[in-house]
Amino acid sequence: MRTLLIMAVLLLGVEGSLLQLRKMIKKMTNKEPILSYSKYGCNCGMAGRGKPVDATDTCCSIHNCCYGKVTSCSTKWDSYSYSWENGDIVCDEKHPCKDVCECDKAVATCFRDNLDTYKKRNIFHPTSSCVKVSTPC
């Protein structure tokens, strides 16, 4: 249900963190994030937390932990400011939601750097086979 809500918001064109994250991932990986990552492995999207199935899923685990440390802004709805320089994301140092931007930059870069571990079979990885991790962060 939450995935459908997120997709609906993205389709409305709201300029918030989720849309900005989508744009970063799309540009870095050339993959449509909603289709490629929203249900990937044990940690991407709304799948929850568990032992990562591969390096791509580890990117999501790290991203979840990063979001858990953000206190100043909404990780889903508040927008931030960033630019592209030589194919890299540069977060605006002075923006109040810079921490959210840095989390999103890290996961988009991680996805790009681990494209060789991405497996289509992990898109709908059954959560029942995810091994819970007592301290994921």
UniProtKB/Swiss-Prot annotation:
Expressed by the venom gland. InterPro entries: PLipase_A2, PLipase_A2_Asp_AS, PLipase_A2_dom, PLipase_A2_dom_sf, PLipase_A2_His_AS. It is found in: Secreted. Keywords: Blood coagulation cascade inhibiting toxin, Disulfide bond, Hemostasis impairing toxin, Myotoxin, Secreted, Signal, Toxin. Pfam families: Phospholip_A2_1. It comes from the Eukaryota. One of its GO terms (molecular function) is calcium ion binding. SMART domains: PA2c. One of its GO terms (cellular component) is extracellular region. Belongs to the phospholipase A2 family. Group II subfamily. N49 sub-subfamily. This is Basic phospholipase A2 homolog CTs-R6. It comes from Trimeresurus stejnegeri (Chinese green tree viper).
